[in-house]
Structure formats: C-alpha cells, structure tokens
C-alpha cells in the first residue's frame, strides 16, 4: 500500500452532511469536469498519479486545501 492516500470520500461525506444532501459523481462532474471514472478511483484510493488540475478542482468543489485531501501515512 502506498504511503500517500487521499481523503476524498471522507471529505465528500462531510460536505454531504453539512449540506444535508447526497452528492453524486455526476453532480461533481457537472461542476468540475472531472470524469466519474476518475472520481471513483479517488473514492477507492486507486489513484496512481495525482494530477494538479484534478486536485485544484476537487479542492475548490470540496472547499478544502490540498493537505486536507492528500495525506502521507508513515508505515
């Protein structure tokens, strides 16, 4: 397992809770242009390369900082 993981699913669930609504990958795609297949990889921590443009769009959508989204876990 890579020591770099993302917290996309957790932060998305927090946003859903705060806004009291379910947010689909289609909703995110409509607002960000990020493919639903890419969002699925983020949600399941199967991202192999972290693209700066994708990170920027996710951070804007989720209203978070890159350091909130991607973390390094020491083994």
Regions found by a protein language model. Give the residues of each.
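Short alpha-helical DNA-recognition segment
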Residues: 20-41
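Short, charged recognition helix plus adjacent turn
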Residues: 41, 70-75
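A short, Lys/Arg-rich alpha-helix, primarily the initiator
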Residues: 1-27
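Short alpha-helical elements of helix-turn-helix
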Residues: 6, 51-53
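Helix-turn-helix/winged-helix DNA-binding modules
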Residues: 20, 47-50, 61
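DNA major-groove recognition helix of helix-turn-helix/homeodomain DNA-binding modules
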Residues: 53-68
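Short, charged early-sequence alpha-helical segments and their helix-coil boundaries
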Residues: 39-40, 44-49
């Amino acid at each position: 397992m890579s020591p770099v993981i993302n917290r996309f699913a957790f932060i998305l669930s927090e946003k859903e809770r705060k806004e009291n609504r379910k947010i689909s990958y289609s909703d995110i795609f409509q607002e960000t242009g990020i493919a639903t297949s890419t969002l699925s990889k983020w949600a399941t921590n199967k991202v192999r390369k972290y693209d700066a443009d994708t990170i920027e769009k996710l951070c804007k959508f989720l209203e978070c900082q890159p350091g909130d989204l991607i973390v390094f876990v020491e083994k």
